Regions:
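Short, acidic/glycine-rich phosphate-metal binding loop used to engage nucleotide
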Residues: 22, 31-32, 79-82, 120-122
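Phosphate-binding glycine-rich loop
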Residues: 10-54, 67-71
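Short alpha-helical
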Residues: 33, 62-63, 139
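Conserved N-terminal alpha-helix of the aminotransferase class I/II PLP-enzyme fold
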Residues: 1-33, 197-220
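Active-site region of PLP-dependent enzymes
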Residues: 103-105, 109, 113-220
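Phosphate- and divalent-cation-binding pockets in alpha/beta enzyme and binding domains
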Residues: 37, 63, 143
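PLP-dependent aminotransferase-like
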Residues: 40-107
Length: 220
């Protein structure tokens, strides 16, 4: 349980859980880092030490193939009809979903890791910067909570026991100021009678990433 200034981030996670239907939510500083953490957990959970291949649409936000490569994988760009993508897509063969273009009531897909985004001018929930992981795996939830916070629990590091469920983590924690904004703005997604509102998936154009040499070293 979070204490002190960290409580507001936990409160925002509970609100996201209520709205999306996900049993657990882990907030991070941006959605790209959410994808990275899920991919890292995928390799740990499945004892993957060699290069693994992940399908990525050839038109998507550029950080997606970057995070696959950072996590030790290789990218298989898949063909996209047209110049846009709409809504969430799965990073097969994993159960990780890039859900940057989706945010709606009861959106959670069971047995998945759904990475949502609050960054940029197009998102339904605009927090300037931020992201979250929706999931229903308790072990993964515990690992991700510590992995996103430099291996820390949500308490003073002077009082932390770093050897309790140890994780070598990263500094991806969502700042309390952002979570506070999220707590205020998420109320717009409820009707006056308290029922949740449903939002249309976003559709955005992206460059054809498979045309660029940048990712060639990490492409299957």
């Amino acid at each position: 349980m979070a204490v002190g200034v960290h409580k507001v981030t936990e409160d925002f996670e509970k609100e996201l859980s209520k709205y999306t239907g996900a049993p657990y939510v882990v907030c991070v500083d941006n959605q790209s880092n959410a994808l990275f953490l899920c991919l890292k957990y995928y390799t740990i959970k499945n004892n993957i030490t060699d290069n693994f291949v992940v399908d990525v649409p050839e038109r998507t936000y550029p950080s997606v193939p970057c995070e696959v490569i950072h996590a030790g994988g290789k990218v298989n760009f898949t063909e996209v009809d047209g110049t846009t993508i709409c809504g969430a897509y799965q990073l097969t063969p994993t159960n990780i979903w890039d859900s940057a273009l989706s945010f709606t009531a009861n959106m959670y897909i069971p047995n998945s890791f759904m990475c949502i985004s609050f960054t940029g001018p197009y998102k339904h929930l605009k927090l300037s910067k931020g992201g979250a992981i929706l999931l229903d795996d308790l072990d993964a939830y515990r690992w991700l909570k510590k992995a996103r916070f430099s291996g820390r629990d949500e308490c003073s590091y002077h009082e932390d026991d770093f050897d309790n469920n140890p994780v070598i983590g990263w500094n991806f924690y969502m700042m309390p100021e952002i979570a506070t904004r999220g707590l205020l703005l998420i109320q717009q997604f409820y009707n006056n009678d308290g029922t949740p509102k449903y939002n249309e998936d976003l559709e955005l154009p992206y460059p054809k990433l498979s045309n660029f040499d940048l990712w060639k070293g990490g492409v299957k």
